[in-house]
Amino acid sequence: MENITEVTEFILMGFTDNADLEILSFFLFLAIYLFTLMGNLGLITLVIGDSRLHNPMYYFLSVLSSVDACYSTVITPQMVVDFVSEKKVISFIGCATQMFLAVTFGTTECFLLAAMAYDRYVAIHNPLMYVVSMSPRVYVPLIIASYAGGILHAVIHTVATFRLSFCGSNKISHIFCDIPPLLAISCSDTHFNQLLLFYCAGFIEVVTILIVLLSYGFILSVILKTRSTEGKRKVFSTCGSHLMAVSTFHGTVLFMYVRPSDSYALEHDMMVSIFYSIVIPMLNPLIYSLRNKDVKEAIKKVFGKRILCG
């Protein structure tokens, strides 16, 4: 009988083995991570500290910021450490944990963006009744459901992936433990896993994008009925940042997961993963801050107080 040795740890190969490029990447991604934390935690602090931001729209935004901060924390610190490590090793349990958390926060963000689109529709359709229509009885369950959906999706894929055998190469051609590169090195039949990934990710994408499209379809009908130019400008300002965040996030996720497995190109996909898991969490606070009047006013208020105190 042939002895089969199961893998007990994995090696994250990353996107380069050039020593000079690794040092440069270390400082670059460390700066991105610190900027991500500063931006997202700063936005959460603004929402908590400024009474003008105490409404469902900004509660959703603060939850999105917490998800982005956690999502980046699951991936970036490990990658940064690997840039200056001789052995880029992650344990079997560590890999499973990283994948579970990455899928949880990534999926939660999909659901949250859909909930935020619905929230924008409610606010614009009947602004006078917004606080009543989007009361804690409505937005709190939406937030909880987003997390629950993310956790359930992560459990499905983590269990399905780590029940496979890893008895050959333990080198993952990626920056973190993601589903496609793990399936690529498994010595088991991964056909079921590939179908599971395609249909689960596809279902989530279709449902959440449909909610976004319907919400913004209704918003557009409201805009067309609005005669006031100032009213239209305010609506576009409010919704533009959310549409930008939705487009960038869903575009990369669709490209990464909802396509035939034989079209995967791990090196190319790695760059896409960096964008949606590291760059987008950094950009979201900027997108929402620069295009949102209330957030900009809150920032000016904070810095104004510091200047006066100084």
Swiss-Prot record:
One of its GO terms (cellular component) is plasma membrane. Residues 1-23, 74-97, 153-194, 257-269 are extracellular. Keywords: Cell membrane, Disulfide bond, G-protein coupled receptor, Glycoprotein, Membrane, Olfaction, Receptor, Sensory transduction, Transducer, Transmembrane, Transmembrane helix. Residues 45-52, 119-131, 216-235, 291-310 are cytoplasmic. One of its GO terms (biological process) is sensory perception of smell. Glycans are attached at N3. The keyword Mitochondrion does not apply. It is a multi-pass membrane protein. PANTHER family: OLFACTORY RECEPTOR. This is Olfactory receptor 5T7. It comes from Mus musculus (Mouse). The gene is Or5t7.
